[in-house]
Amino acid sequence: MARLTKRRQADTKAIQHLWAAIEIIRNQKQIANIDRITKYMSRVHGMHPKETTRQLSLAVKDGLIVETLTVGCKGSKAGIEQEGYWLPGDEIDWETETHDWYCFECHLPGEVLICDLCFRVYHSKCLSDEFRLRDSSSHWQCPVCRSIKKKHSNKQEMGTYLRFIVSRMKERAIDLNKKGKDSKHPMYRRLVHSAVDVPTIQEKVNEGKYRSYEEFKADAQLLLHNTVIFYGADSEQADIARMLYKDTCHELDELQLCKNCFYLSNARPDNWFCYPCIPNHELVWAKMKGFGFWPAKVMQKEDNQVDVRFFGHHHQRAWIPSENIQDITVNVHRLHVKRSMGWKKACDELELHQRFLREGRFWKSKNEDRGEEEAESSISSTSNEQLKVTQEPRAKKGRRNQSVEPKKEEPEPETEAVSSSQEIPTMPQPIERVSVSTQTKKLSASSPRMLHRSTQTTSDGVCQSMCHDKYTKIFNDFKDRMKSDHKRETERVVREALEKLRSEMEEEKRQAVNKAVASLQGDMDRKGKQLKEKCKEEFVEEIKKLAAQHKQLISQTKKKQWCYNCEEEAMYHCCWNTSYCSIKCQQEHWHAEHKRTCRRKR
């Protein structure tokens, strides 16, 4: 059942200041009473004594500071019982602390509404109308739990996208870790209920623990929540965490806008902007203020504004008024554009994108391309084998025709018989005997030889043409494969050379930096040593001067006589070791004791 309750009341930043005050006072072996804490807070943090007293009482109620009665053992309050304050222990009863202590939206204490499914709490004023509690007897779910409950995505696909976002978060988190304190601070868990950091988020992404994008976004918001609580809303760490959360929300919005664009813009394969998305983006001519019309993709439309991403080198985004948008089918000459090199490159990229659209060509990974190449090569080899098998029966059929019709004098059957014999070069002699024997019945012995030679020449030409086409095709296929292999090998060699060159440059840079640092350190050490010796010499000289002055002053002091009563310089001599500065001192000392011990002759 949902209920409103006060989990905490004291300000988190004031609590940390009070903790520091108590710790410093205790380290000085003193009782951390209200007076000492108030003076410290006023001197260091400029907090008014009344505000210090109020925050201290709230912290005691919240259990963040322990109040005890302590008896003073020294000073003006020795033996007096007084209130003393201590830091709480490290032990926390997590069975009772099931929910956070501060509003997940504004990160402040006060009367909060507790979620029935998670640890989050909210102020009623921080909730929108749709999430506010309608009936106190009903169960209440926070906005985060409701958003997580709405969607469930493919975990494998979601993990791929979230890895890109986490890599961006790690870059920002470097600054956050540099500016922040260690999360292992002894009082950290007293303020932060559910600790989370970027490495934890990355680990959950790698293990596939997120069920939706909203759950991932909730962890990013939790990181901001913890940072604001521990470091303060106006701290530099909180500004970095807000920027980190804002960037994460922007990345998630871009992902929901178009998953294909999000993946390709992060993976960055060759010609990544040219591959079509599903569904396809509308292509337009867009005109920014101060520029001409430029080819672009429409990402989204809102009221009278169009969000476009331009073709070209940088692929920039911009919101363009709808009146500055023209359909891509509009003739370029009507747009009066300045055809610069950048504009031409953008148009070339547009043409490649349109060609990919016509061909239905979508981006595929290298493994898929390699599988397709292997399939194509196996299909081509199978087709070549089938071509050979179909040619052999044709040759046998030619021989059969030749033996059935041996008496015909037309050149076609003989040409067919000879060409068939050229297709099967292992049996030339039987064909030649058959042709000669058939021709001897009608012609002389010389005629068959001439006819055979002519048909042999004709068949050679036909066979040569067929073989030329066949091997030209095979050679072209082999040439294309060699080109692709050479291109991949060249890219690999260039990539390895670049990596090697980069590593060598980094090594040289590191050595140069180390050398410069060592040289600078040597100069600093040498100058520091010289300065130290100079200061030591000056110190010795100064000590000598002071010693001489001191000796001279002592000598001058010894040569003077001093009043026995008030120790001022004496003017009146009484006896061998007694003098006075005035008659008053002489009378006071005389009546007090000197009249009994004076050795002056009367």
From Swiss-Prot:
Q: What is known of its domains?
A: The PWWP domain specifically recognizes and binds histone H3.3 trimethylated at 'Lys-36' (H3.3K36me3) and adopts a five-bladed beta-barrel fold with an extended C-terminal alpha-helix, with a conserved H3.3K36me3-binding aromatic cage formed by Phe-291 and Trp-294 of the beta1-beta2 loop and Phe-310 of the beta3-beta4 loop. Specific recognition of H3.3 histone is mediated by the encapsulation of the H3.3-specific 'Ser 31' residue in a composite pocket formed by the tandem bromo-PWWP domains.
User: GO terms for CC?
Assistant: chromosome; nucleoplasm; nucleus
Q: What is this protein called?
A: Zinc finger MYND domain-containing protein 11
In its UniProt record, a GO molecular function of this protein is: histone H3K36me3 reader activity
Checking Pfam families in the record gives: Bromodomain (PF00439), MYND_ZMYND11_ZMYD8 (PF24324), PWWP (PF00855), SAMD1_WH (PF21524), ZMYND11_CC (PF23461)
Subunit field text:
Homooligomer; forms homooligomers via its C-terminus. Interacts with histone H3.3 trimethylated at 'Lys-36' (H3.3K36me3). Interacts (via MYND-type zinc finger) with NCOR1. Interacts (via MYND-type zinc finger) with MGA protein (via PXLXP motif). Interacts (via MYND-type zinc finger) with EZH2. Interacts with EMSY and E2F6. Interacts with PIAS1 and UBE2I.
SAMD1-like winged helix (WH) domain ranges (all copies): 6-82
Residue numbers of Phosphoserine PTMs: 421
- Ranges of biased composition (kind: Polar residues): 435-461
Q: What is the effect of changing residue 291 to A?
A: Abolished H3.3K36me3 binding
Q: Which UniProt keywords apply?
A: Bromodomain, Chromatin regulator, Chromosome, DNA-binding, Isopeptide bond, Metal-binding, Nucleus, Phosphoprotein, Repressor, Transcription, Transcription regulation, Tumor suppressor, Ubl conjugation, Zinc, Zinc-finger
User: For the Bromo domain, which residue ranges apply?
Assistant: 149-255
Q: Where is this motif: Nuclear localization signal?
A: 394-400
Q: Which residues bind Zn(2+)?
A: 258, 261, 277, 281
Changing residue 310 to A has the effect of: Abolished H3.3K36me3 binding
Pinpoint the PWWP domain residues. 280-331
The cellular location(s) given in this protein's UniProt record come to:
Nucleus; Chromosome
- Chief subcellular location: nucleus
| Residues engaged in binding Zn(2+) 1 | 563, 566, 581, 585
Q: Where is this region: Aromatic cage required for H3.3K36me3-specific binding?
A: 291-310
UniProt PTM: Ubiquitinated, leading to proteasomal degradation.
Q: Which domain of life is it from?
A: Eukaryota
Please name the SUPFAM superfamilies in this protein's record.
Bromodomain (SSF47370), FYVE/PHD zinc finger (SSF57903), HIT/MYND zinc finger-like (SSF144232), Tudor/PWWP/MBT (SSF63748)
**Record cross-link Glycyl lysine isopeptide (Lys-Gly) (interchain with G-Cter in SUMO2), residues:** 366, 407-408
